[in-house]
Amino acid sequence: MGDIEKGKKIFVQKCSQCHTVEKGGKHKTGPNLDGLFGRKTGQAEGFSYTDANKNKGITWGEDTLMEYLENPKKYIPGTKMIFAGIKKKSERADLIAYLKDATSK
């Protein structure tokens, strides 16, 4: 399990420009991530996803996020997420720990 505080810093630096995590938070360029864990790809209500995201058909969890966040465009070809990914596994683990905590409140 990663470090939540380190993960929060990574989120602020790399993700918060396009995503929010708080319950009832607005969609930005990317969807609000509240309730992310256990939700299928392309299912955040009120966000316009690509067909690639809607049709991927996986459920978000630690393992799927670990793979996705390494290289989003490889994991979901056709996604509109313009993020290159996080190559360091420890940084992905920290971010996932933060997301698990922040999106389930």
From Swiss-Prot:
Q: What cellular component terms from Gene Ontology apply here? A: mitochondrial intermembrane space
* Post-translation changes: Binds 1 heme c group covalently per subunit.
Q: Does the keyword Electron transport apply?
A: yes
Q: Which UniProt keywords apply?
A: Acetylation, Electron transport, Heme, Iron, Metal-binding, Mitochondrion, Respiratory chain, Transport
List ligand-binding residues for heme c.
15, 18-19, 81
**Is Electron transport one of the keywords?**
yes
What are the N-acetylglycine sites (modified residues) in this protein?
A: 2
Which GO MF term does the entry hold, naming one? metal ion binding
What is one Pfam family matched by this protein? Cytochrom_C
Stored InterPro entries: Cyt_c-like_dom (IPR009056), Cyt_c-like_dom_sf (IPR036909), Cyt_c_1A/1B (IPR002327)
- Which locations, inside or outside the cell, does it occupy? Mitochondrion intermembrane space
Family indicated by similarity = Belongs to the cytochrome c family.
Give the protein's recorded name: Cytochrome c
The encoding gene: CYC
